[in-house]
Every structure is written in C-alpha cells, then in structure tokens.
Amino acid sequence: MTKRKHSSKLVDGPLQAASRSMLRGVGFSSEDFKKPLVGVASTWSKVTPCNMHINDLAEIVEQSIDESNCKAVLFNTITVSDGISMGTEGMKYSLVSREVIADSIETVVGCLGYDGLVAIGGCDKNMPGALIGMARLNRPSLFIYGGSIKPSHENTDYVTVCEKTGEYAKGDISEDELIRIEEISVKGPGSCGGMYTANTMASAIEALGMSLPGSSSQDAISNNKKHDCKEAGTAIEHLIELDLKPSDIMTKEAFENAITAVIALGGSTNAVLHLLAMADAIGVDLHLDDFSRIGENVPVVADIKPFGNHFMSELNEQGGISPVLKMLLDKNLLHGDCLTVTGKTLAENLENISPYNSSQGIIKSLEDPIKGSSHLRILYGNLAPEGAVAKITGQEGTTFEGKARVFNSEEDGNQAILNKEIKAGDVVVIRYEGPKGGPGMREMLKPTSAIMGQGLGDKVAFITDGRFSGGTHGFVVGHISPEAEVGGPIALIEDDDLIRIDAESNELILLVDEEILQERKRNLKNINMSPKKGVLAKYKHLVGSASKGAVTDSYDQ
C-alpha cells in the first residue's frame, strides 16, 4: 500500500503540473511532492481562552511533521465559545458548530488529497467535530487536545462565576463581590478546568485510542503539551506507514472503552450525544442502552468538578487519566486489545503505567468509589419514549416528584429563576430547546447554575429537551426525546402537572391520565418561529433526534 494513496493523485505526473505550481507558491519544494501530505487542522481563535494558543501548538505539530518523512499543510476551521454565548440566542449555534467543524475538515482534506490528518482542538465542540470529520474521511488521523486552563488562586473557574450569579440574584453576595470573582476566575489559555465537556471529550478520545497516551489531562501551557505536539510527526508518519485508519481504531469495543472512561471520571452528559454522533460517522452501532449496560458495572471514582472538589490540572500532577484506565483494565472493565494511534493496543500502552500515589485524594479506588454505578442515567417513560439523559450523582438523591413549572424558552425559565419564582419541590421544564426546536439544542448552564446559587440544587429538579453544560450539576434530565418541536410528550406538560424522576428504575413519568394527554395532543399548536434562511434553517431541516446523536447526515432517521 503506497504511503501517498491520496496525494499522488494530486501531484504526480506531468498533467498535475498546475497543482504543483500552486503548492510551490505556498513553499513546497520538489522533494516535498515525494512525501505523504498531512493536513493539520487548527481551531485557533481569539474568541475564547480555550483556543487562543492553538496556533502555537499547531506550528509545533507542523514542524514535527516536516521533520518526519511527511509534509504538513496547516489550515484552520472554526470554533465558538459556549461560555460566552451561554444563556443567549447565540448559544443556538454551539452544537451547530460541531457539524461545521466536521464538514469543513472533511471538505479541506477531501478536496486537497491529504494522506493523513492531525487535528488540534480546545473548546467543547472541537473534539467531536474533529473526530466526526476524521471518521468520514477514514484516513490515518490523530487528535491533539489543546489542554486545560489552571484554576485561579482562589480555586475558582468559569462555572464558579455562573453559580455566583445565582448567589447575587438571591442577595447573598454584592455586585462588587460578583465582579471580583469574575475578574480572577479565567486567566490565560486553556479549556475549562473541571470534568466539563472539553475535558470529558478529551478523556473519551484518549480512551477511544485516537490521541496519544497521557495527552488529555495536560495543562494548555506546559512542556508536556509541547512534547505531545512534538510527538505528532512521528506518530502520524507511523499511522500512514501502517495505513492504520479511524475505522481500525474506532470500533464498538473502543467506544465502550470511551464510555467506561467517561463514567469513571464523572464526565459530562454531552459525551452521550457526541459519542453517539462519532459512532454514527464511523458506522458503529452505538445506542443509548449501551450507556446503561456499561454503567451498571462501572463506578464513578473521580472527585473532580463540577460535583467534586478538584480540577483536571490537579489530576495531571498525579499522572493524568492513564492510571485510571490501568485500574479499569486490571478489573476487566476495558477492552485491552483495541488498537490506538500509537500502533499498539490499549493494554500495551498501559503496560508500564504506575498506580496513583496512595496519598492523593482525587481518584478513589474501584472498591470504595464515589458512586457505585454510573452517574449518567438513561431514562425512559411516557415523557421520554425515545430516551433522556440524566446526570445524577446521588448527592441530590435518586428520585424526585414535583409539580411542573413550564417554560417555552430558556430565557423565560431563567428569568423566573432569577426572580425567585421557583420554589422547593418544583420541576422546572424548559422545552422547545431541542435540536430542531431551538434550533440548536442550547445548554442550560445559566438556569441550572442560578438554581444551585440560590441553594435549591437538591430541592428542585430540571428537565429539558435541550442539553446541559459539562459544568451543570443538580437533579437534571436533558436530551428528552422526542423533543417538543416534533410533538414529543414534553410539549404536553402543563403547569402543576406531577412529574416523577426515578434514577433507580430509570423512569421519567408524567403523572397525567392518558386520555387527558391525548386531548392535549389533539389541541397542540406549534408555538415556535422557525428560521427561514441561513445555517440554523439548514440545521433544523437536517438534524435528527438527540437520542441518536443529533447528526445531520443520516437521512433515514
């Protein structure tokens, strides 16, 4: 198998002189045309701290590839910032950006005949977007995570600011104190520092086998992260030499490894959505029920924010996630024979990993975990016939029954919470925020943080057909499918209806007689204003159910 399977069609022979001429214009030499071409997809942007340093890393990757027997070509794709747009109309574009990233990477690499691909990402949607693009292309590929931000000197971060906003609304802190926390909490480059969505997905990708061992926990600004980038050239050259493609690595068993890691680390509900979409892109049959099946046997062992006490940078100082993976492998909770981007199996990568220092308090033992089974619960019932995803650690209890307070947008719900209209025992329902309904399936960090900040985290439940930030904690259920926009049962809820959430029986039940629900369904009117043009209109037309990953290129859904 030639190492230049794709680029040879672009640059070889007299008839490709014009193509070569263009490439000479960007600095190619005659020798470069004899090498495999490797695209380096950078998500650099100054719109967010998560990505402001990515081009520095991309240039190290570019140099490392050029120093191997390959030729790097650096290009950019987009990023948006969930943290900046949270709670606004702009958040409707967040999940959409996952598809734009995947589409743009696929477009550039497919158009320009690259033999391999290295993608570097920071903010939440960069990771699944890059992996979806890699899966579609199915050429030797490697992902590099941009790394975590360090917490402030007071151990605060972005999520702290969100929750302090709730405390301010309640009257517990002054505006001056809120601004003080705002000013100190996000300093410099890197992704949000807890086990929020970015770190969850970076960890999942390492467990999946698509990034180099140890890379998911590194600080954004560190020698370790630079070293990770310097290793990329040798790694991608080896992958091209072996013709080791994403389809060889991203198997059903590898996805089960990723799910196991996400659960053990107490990861974000967004991992469910993104892993389903990544599996769909590579042709792996992954379902919500796989998360339930695996979750019954995998405990939560990481005491990491949002519901724990530590940050990813602290875990990195103890050895990152590799010792966690080794713990899981030793208990036969991982498939050790899965291939990885090193060309070795997961078990071979972990063979010489030492256990954590016994004095560290971040990772608990499998025998004495934080929670004995998964915090990610897949719920079904008359409110979620196609499923819903709950994030329940047990700190807030495992069952909740209360009266519905119904809102048809995030803004309406958030305002009611800030106005102190939500009381203990309520079930906040925010609907018409699903993939089609938003459109865009916004994250509900602002309202859930306001609930936590007002001291109602264990007294109020929150359900939505939208989704949650990785920073969300409390009694929350999202991804309710079918969504309100397509007439799902969540559209039928009225104020004061009783709702029962049971994370033990995995049920989400609307306690209203079926005859009444059928009458409501007959009288249901679509209240949503649909976009007529632009990316949101295209997305609404194409996107499928959250229960299948909210993908945009499966036309038989």
Explain the meaning of each model-derived region.
Residues 94-103:
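Glycine-rich, highly charged phosphate/nucleotide-binding loops
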Residues 109-130, 142-145:
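A short, small-residue-rich loop immediately preceding and capping a beta-strand
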Residues 1-52, 57-78, 83-84, 89-94, ...:
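Catalytic or ion-coupling anion/metal-binding cores of large enzyme and transporter domains
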